[in-house]
Amino acid sequence: MFDWIHGNSRLPIALSIVELLVDMDCKGCEKKVRRAISKLDGVDTVEIDVDRQKVTVTGYVDREEVLKMVKRTGRTAEYWPFPYNGYYGDYYTYPSQHLEQSDQKIYQTISYSGKYDFYDVDDFQNTNNSTINGYYPSSSQKVQPNIDENALHLFSDDNAHACTIM
């Protein structure tokens, strides 16, 4: 583990937390994965949650070595694909909650007012202070298009003289 003391050029590995998503079905799978990870040098703790398919390894280990060792057990494994925030701990109990939360954030930042605003392409202004960067027309520059009233009623079902192609 501390080869750098004996003249090896490798730098020491810092204390790290490695989170993996591992396909485990039973206690036997859990035991096999725990035993394989425990054989690695520098592992302090191994926490396995079979319900969430999550393995958390704490210690002075390289995350690539941990992933390789878990894959050698025959289980499919990948890095935990959901965010970890140390302040909240395991904020997302299950992976599907992360997806639901991210969808809600998108819907909260993009609001729909219920009416369509018409504007000219040349009248955009740059607003970099919004949560979604892009070009938005200012409220004074919005223009209603010129649409003939007869053209709107041409294909109406209420009009007896309407186009009969449809």
Swiss-Prot record:
Instruction: Give this protein's Gene Ontology molecular function annotations.
Output: metal ion binding
Species the sequence originates in: Arabidopsis thaliana (Mouse-ear cress)
Q: Does the keyword Endoplasmic reticulum apply?
A: no
Residues modified as Cysteine methyl ester:
C163
Q: Output this protein's name.
A: Heavy metal-associated isoprenylated plant protein 45
**Domain HMA per the UniProt entry, residue ranges:** 15-78
Propeptide stretches are 164-166
**What taxonomic classification does the UniProt entry list for its organism?**
Eukaryota, Viridiplantae, Streptophyta, Embryophyta, Tracheophyta
Q: Which Pfam families does the entry mention? A: HMA
The entry's family comment says: Belongs to the HIPP family.
InterPro entries in alphabetical order: Heavy-metal-associated_CS, HMA_dom, HMA_dom_sf
Q: Which UniProt keywords apply?
A: Lipoprotein, Metal-binding, Methylation, Prenylation
Give the function comment from the record: Heavy-metal-binding protein.
Q: Where does a metal cation bind?
A: C26, C29
Does the record bear DNA-binding in its keywords? no
Which chain positions have S-farnesyl cysteine-type lipid attachment? Answer: C163
